[in-house]
Amino acid sequence: MKNILILLTVLLLPLAADGQDKPSFSAREMADVRVATPGLFAKGNHIYLHLDSLKDHEYAFPLPGGKVISAYGTRGGHSGTDIKTCAKDTIRAAFDGVVRMSKPYYAYGNIVVIRHANGLETLYSHNFKNLVKTGDLVKAGQAIGLTGRTGRATTEHVHFETRINGQHFNPNLIF
C-alpha cells in the first residue's frame, strides 16, 4: 500500500460537507476546530500526499492487529473508522507530529489529536488512557494511548479520524 499516490479533490469533499453528512463536532466543540486556510478546498485546489515516498518507519497503523468494526461514512456519516482489539491495547501514532490535544472531550471521551508536518491531523478517541500530553513530539509507531470505552462508545476500541484543515476524509485512503 506504500506505493499509493493520494489525490484529494474538491470534487469529492463537498459530498461530506453538503448537509447530508452529520457534523462530527457540536457547536461548542467547533470552537476548537478551525480551518486554517479556508480557500484550500476551493474548486480546483488539490492536495497531494506522496505516501510512496515514506519509509516503513515513517508511518504506522494505529492499532496493529485490530479489526474494523465501523467503517468511515457508515451509520449516517461516521467521520472516522472504529478499530477494535482487546481492552487497553496500545494505540500508536500514524505519523510523526505534535500532540495538539490530549484530554477528555465530550462524546469522544479521552482524545488525542496529532498535527503532522504536511497539514494532516489524526484523531484517536474513546481511549482508556492517554499516554501523551498536549505539546509532546511523537514519532510514527509511538504509543500514545490505550484502547477504551470513554465518551459515547459501546465497546472498547479506537475511533480513528484523518483531517486536513478540519475536513475529515476516509482513513482508508492512507492505509
Q: What are the roles of these predicted feature ranges?
A:
Residues 81-84, 111-116, 159-161:
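Short, acidic/hydrophobic/Gly-rich beta-strand patch recurrent on exposed beta strands
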Residues 1-8, 12-71:
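Polar/charged, compositionally biased leader and regulatory segments
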Residues 78, 94-131:
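Zn2+-dependent peptidoglycan hydrolase active-site motif and core
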Residues 64, 87, 95-96, 108, ...:
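Short, flexible surface segments
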Residues 70, 85, 101, 126-129, ...:
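A residue-level detector for short acidic-glycine micro-motifs
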Residues 53-60, 73-104:
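Short, glycine/small-residue-enriched coil/turn segments at secondary-structure junctions
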Residues 134-175:
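Conserved, short, structured surface segments that act as functional micro-motifs
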Residues 84, 90-94, 124-125, 135-138, ...:
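Small beta-strand-rich domains/subdomains or short beta-sheet motifs embedded
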